[in-house]
Amino acid sequence: MSISLTESAAQRVSSFLSHRGKGVGLRLGVRTSGCSGMAYLLEFADMINEDDTVFEDKGVKVIVDGKSMVYLDGTELDFVKEGLNEGFKFNNPNVSSECGCGESFNV
């Protein structure tokens, strides 16, 4: 089981954590939402819970709760800039379909 970050994503997360001044890492998860069933969660973590799995890649701790791990295993988090837009992108090998707007997915 693993979660990885591109160099671009690791730099962006490190920058956010540095400016924030606190936090142990980046928490990734999934929740039920959208027209395809699930949506990604991405937030800063101030603590690690008992059921969390912790990965470290390129100096960044990535924290995933036990329920989300089955959906996120093998995912690579990237940070992309496309024109005037920029943001994090999940490259998830478990996804079988995505909704048209790209906000939700199914496995």
Curated annotation (Swiss-Prot):
MF-aspect GO terms: 2 iron, 2 sulfur cluster binding; iron ion binding
Keyword Metal-binding: yes
GO biological process: iron-sulfur cluster assembly
Gene3D superfamilies, sorted: HesB-like domain
Reported cofactor(s): Fe cation
Any matching Pfam family: Fe-S_biosyn
Annotated InterPro entries: Fe-S_cluster_asmbl/transfer (IPR050322), FeS_biogenesis (IPR000361), FeS_cluster_insertion (IPR016092), FeS_cluster_insertion_CS (IPR017870), HesB-like_dom_sf (IPR035903), IscA_proteobacteria (IPR011302)
Record keywords: Iron, Metal-binding
UniProt remark on cofactor binding: Binds 2 iron ions per dimer. The dimer may bind additional iron ions.
List of residues binding Fe cation: C35, C99, C101
GO cellular component, one term: cytosol
Keyword Iron among record annotations: yes
Subunit structure comment from the entry: Homodimer; may form tetramers and higher multimers.
Record function comment: Is able to transfer iron-sulfur clusters to apo-ferredoxin. Multiple cycles of [2Fe2S] cluster formation and transfer are observed, suggesting that IscA acts catalytically. Recruits intracellular free iron so as to provide iron for the assembly of transient iron-sulfur cluster in IscU in the presence of IscS, L-cysteine and the thioredoxin reductase system TrxA/TrxB.
Protein family: Belongs to the HesB/IscA family.
Name this polypeptide is given: Iron-binding protein IscA
Organism whose genome encodes this protein: Photorhabdus laumondii subsp. laumondii (strain DSM 15139 / CIP 105565 / TT01) (Photorhabdus luminescens subsp. laumondii)
